């Protein structure tokens, strides 16, 4: 029986069971848990390789074979870290397992035929496309930036660089909602829009849901009072949509206890739950310990570094239309920036009490850094806190699964999209990202939308091969024409679907309908469902979880930073 060394095997087919892979320049290592490919019968494309007529490629017609196969990929998802071939059919993940030709190979469940294209996944890591659940739609150019970072779904609100959108993630009213839904047809990005939730009577909120909003946003700049919270959640309960909230920093209409009371145990997504992005000062972080609260962070505080606090003050003044010459405005800004709660946020992410990470794009957040900031946080916690319970010293599989869930499956669950997107699982839209391990979380190689490459690192188009410099991200064929619309989803509410909004607006994108938004709870946040009792000292801002002080030092140096970027 022929054998080959592990190194030679990894070089040819990628790592296999027991092999470890370092994530970029972090201190994080993942280990392959299972290999679904069959030793000796692996498939690989190229001259003298396996996927050729009569060998790894069958004679079957297109109806019985995959449209696209990704070979020998290392999948990193909340459910596992496995080596497998991935079969894609009609834009969806059709199978995860062993690809090839069943006429000559055993155990084939992904059939390759003349109608099949191939992406070589050997040596690459595959993740689900990221989901950014806190978007200010200030400019459409954000979408290219996000896509190039590995994000394939954006959830939020706005209508462009209006003063309202600069500060709040709100697309207010049916007319604005219709225009944004029409604009969504132009982008290779799944989009879902939040209406304005700040009202004390239901009619103006219900009409936004019927117009296409996937949920409502409560923001303090529009007046997040207990009455508006109660009313907004009541409308959401009737329409099976989600509510996102940015609470009252100034405690004008009530304190955190009043806001929690207004929730009445109903599900709500709390944005930037630590509070630097906004929320009851100094103790909105307490909400992360509630069973009905789905807590997320935005990336400016991810992770806590020596520069975090200083950077925030200037950002805050601009984003919330504050005047540095007005003492009250300066005091408002300073009340939101607390080193103690930001430090605690790091640890609460590591322990799974904070469930999601998003950007807060151009409104105190960087739209292209959700993935990177997530893994920087994971690295910082590994360095400062060591291995998590459940991880041996050799690898960080549990921690990696916990952190990847924060920007993939958990926001999908929170916003009723997990039946369509959010993970590398059979039946879901094939929104996938290929990474070289050395560039993991920083610069993806390929971004696949609905089974077709939408963006990629690409060299000089006039060169004789694809790789010569300058190499940068360029839109691919999946980002153009009707192909873009066939591979992209616009999400709306069931009420909007029943009202015929896609037909009324002649929307061209595939339509996804959100569901299960009112039944999802913290316990459903995969690998991120811890419910500690959180307390904040009103004088020192120290945070305790179940009585234990949560504190850590700010990072002075981070991975995934200047080693990869000039600016």
Swiss-Prot record:
CC terms in the record's Gene Ontology section: cytoplasm
PANTHER family for the chain: UREASE
Name of the protein described by the UniProt record: Urease subunit alpha
Known catalytic reactions: urea + 2 H2O + H(+) = hydrogencarbonate + 2 NH4(+)
Description of how the protein assembles with itself and partners: Heterotrimer of UreA (gamma), UreB (beta) and UreC (alpha) subunits. Three heterotrimers associate to form the active enzyme.
Pfam families reported in the protein's UniProt record: Amidohydro_1, Urease_alpha
UniProt binding sites for substrate: 219
Cofactor detail note: Binds 2 nickel ions per subunit.
Cofactor(s) needed for function: Ni cation
Organism: Alcanivorax borkumensis (strain ATCC 700651 / DSM 11573 / NCIMB 13689 / SK2)
Class in the EC hierarchy, top level: hydrolase
Gene, per the UniProt record: ureC
């Amino acid at each position: 029986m022929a054998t080959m060394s592990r190194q030679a095997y990894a070089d040819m087919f990628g790592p296999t069971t027991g092999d470890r892979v370092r994530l970029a320049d972090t201190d994080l290592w993942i280990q392959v848990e299972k290999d679904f490919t069959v030793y000796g019968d692996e498939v690989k494309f190229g001259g003298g390789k396996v996927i050729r007529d009569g060998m790894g490629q069958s004679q079957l017609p297109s109806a019985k074979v995959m449209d696209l196969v990704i070979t020998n990929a290392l999948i990193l998802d909340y459910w596992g870290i496995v080596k497998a071939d991935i079969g894609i059919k009609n834009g969806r993940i059709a199978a995860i397992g062993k690809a090839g030709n069943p006429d000559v190979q055993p155990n084939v469940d992904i059939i390759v035929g003349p109608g099949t294209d191939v992406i070589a996944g050997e040596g690459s890591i595959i993740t689900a496309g990221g989901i950014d659940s806190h978007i200010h739609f200030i400019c459409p150019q954000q979408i290219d930036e996000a896509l190039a970072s590995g994000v394939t779904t954006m959830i939020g609100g706005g209508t462009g660089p209006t003063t309202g959108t600069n500060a709040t993630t709100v697309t207010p009213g049916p007319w604005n909602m219709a225009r944004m839904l029409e604009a969504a047809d132009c982008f290779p990005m799944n989009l879902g829009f939040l209406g304005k939730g700040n009202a004390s009577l239901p009619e103006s909120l219900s009409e936004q849901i019927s117009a296409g909003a996937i949920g409502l946003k409560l923001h303090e700049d529009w007046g997040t009072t207990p009455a508006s919270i109660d009313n907004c959640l009541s409308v959401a309960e009737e329409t099976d949509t989600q509510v996102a909230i940015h609470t009252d920093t100034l405690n004008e209409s009530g304190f955190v206890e009043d806001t929690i009371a207004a929730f009445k145990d109903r599900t709500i997504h709390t944005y930037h739950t630590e509070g630097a992005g906004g929320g009851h000062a100094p103790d909105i972080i307490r909400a992360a310990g509630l069973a009905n609260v789905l807590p997320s962070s935005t990336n400016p505080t991810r992770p806590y570094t020596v520069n975090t606090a200083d950077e925030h003050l200037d950002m805050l003044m601009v984003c919330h239309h504050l005047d540095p010459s007005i003492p009250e405005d300066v005091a408002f800004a300073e009340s939101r920036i607390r080193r103690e709660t930001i430090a605690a946020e790091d640890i609460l992410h590591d322990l799974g009490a904070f469930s999601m990470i998003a950007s807060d794009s151009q409104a105190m957040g960087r739209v292209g850094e959700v993935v990177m900031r997530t893994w920087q946080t994971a690295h910082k916690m590994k360095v400062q806190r060591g291995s998590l319970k459940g991880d041996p010293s050799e690898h960080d599989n549990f921690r990696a699964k916990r952190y990847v869930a924060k920007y993939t499956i958990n926001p999908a669950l929170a916003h009723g999209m997990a039946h369509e997107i959010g993970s590398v699982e059979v039946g879901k839209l094939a929104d996938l990202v290929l990474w070289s391990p050395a560039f993991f979380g920083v610069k993806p190689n390929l971004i696949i939308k609905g089974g077709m490459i939408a963006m990629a690192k690409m060299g000089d188009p006039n060169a004789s091969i694809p790789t010569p410099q300058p190499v940068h991200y360029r839109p691919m064929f999946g980002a153009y024409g009707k192909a873009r619309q066939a591979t992209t989803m616009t999400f709306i509410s069931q009420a909007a679907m029943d009202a015929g909004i896609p037909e009324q607006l002649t929307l061209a994108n595939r339509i996804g309908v959100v569901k299960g938004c009112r039944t999802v709870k913290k316990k459903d946040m995969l690998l991120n469902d811890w419910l500690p009792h959180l307390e904040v000292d009103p004088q020192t801002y120290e945070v305790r979880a179940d009585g234990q002080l949560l504190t850590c030092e700010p990072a002075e140096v981070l991975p995934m930073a200047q080693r990869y970027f000039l600016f």
